[in-house]
């Protein structure tokens, strides 16, 4: 055993992270990292992707007074900076002609502006590709740690998006090759497969991807606690929904999915 990670006490109050009357004129956060790498104390390594916070900052940066309706608009914003940045990176790394299925997803996604509205087909394509990338990049290595290790990793939504960023930014290339095959896969190979797999996934679960919109596949049901009782649920359903839901975990309008 080691005492390295034993409890050492509380962070001194005057060394706690804070922001007081910043020059930008406002304080905002979207559960994203609030400290720099030089901060001497451990607070957390499980920060939200910076996407939500970035879009909130974009909106608040405008030199204008905000009323209640303006703030409602900020909180309901459905633009994803993560999508804006990485959709073109995904499409640039896809080889057109790889497969008819992959090409169809490519055509849905190219030119997307990152707005995750309920009538957007590109949002469907982006999230399908993103989730297949997570699977194709990490499942092979994590498999060696046990059959449920990937499921545990997948459930950590903040970590998976930050990991994707690092891989496409060239900081974590060891994850790219599929260690379960004899070939040496490149990132281009993994992206090609992920575009193809995204089409297969959507087709099997929902139907023709070209006919899908974000509001059809991304929905919310507001569940009543009494619905947990099977007898009560048989008699009456107190839950309401499902309703189409714009946005995602990457937008100020927080709408993560499982």
Regions found by a protein language model. Name each.
Residues 104:
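Active-site acid/base region of carbohydrate-active enzymes
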